[in-house]
Amino acid sequence: MKAALRATGFQLEDIDLLAYPWSVTPRKFLHMNLKHVFRVLVLHGPGLAITGMRVIRDLMLPRLIAKRCASEMGKRLPPCDGVSHHLGHSACAYFTLPFDEAVVLTIDGQGEDESGSLGEWVGTSYLHFVSIYSPDSIGILYGMVTDFLGMRAAWDEYKVMGMASYGDPKRFEPQFRSLVEPLPEGRYRTHRTAMVFKPGYCEAMLKRLFNLAARTPDQPLEQVHFDVAAGLQDITEGVVFHLLEHLRKKTRSHNLCLAGGVFQNSVLNGKILCSGLFERVHIPPVPGDHGAR
């Protein structure tokens, strides 16, 4: 916050409202968390503690951040309000570009109850087209496979992206196609991602799917690991282009903005840029959660 004030020349007293890209309304709370509580409680009781911790964190985070900022600034803060996580991603992408209209696609693992959104900005007005709701999430699937390959989910996906260049995407294509289902109107569904927070679930499920033991971090990389990475990258690109083609048909805009953690995948971004679907493509310098703030 101090850096932002210095960069803009504003004082804290000039700010009317602080916006944080996380809005847990009662409806979103019920949709986002209770469905996981009931699913885990009925099917896998031991995982309930993990879900409970996520619920508490999500509800308390905006207040904790505001309290800490006030303490560090040494002043009373303006009102602090949460906005939809994917609206934050969308605004970050749009308001950092040099033109005044664009369609926007956001995709990540999960932000509140959404894992993606499609919409269009004209001036300062936003028209929302489609939301994709967790647990349908190509971002979650990418993290699951990253973990299966012996790396850290939500951290090492870039390594898996690099590994994909050395693999054969056809080897595990049927398995990945069984996990992802394109749907009409710019939607898709991911199968077997609902229980991602249950300890041990992802490893066991992917082991059966690929007929392959999970790699440990100290295990040498083998060709089969590169082939899994290639299949994952290929299905991810397919999902994204499915959504982009819907956007292209729905609007006349030639400008595209992209945001969310999935668009830290530079190989994917390069293919979008070279596809010719849109004349101009803009990705903010930090498309992940840090850029949504």
Sequence positions of predicted segments:
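Short acidic/glycine-rich loops and adjacent helix/strand connectors
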Residues: M1-R293
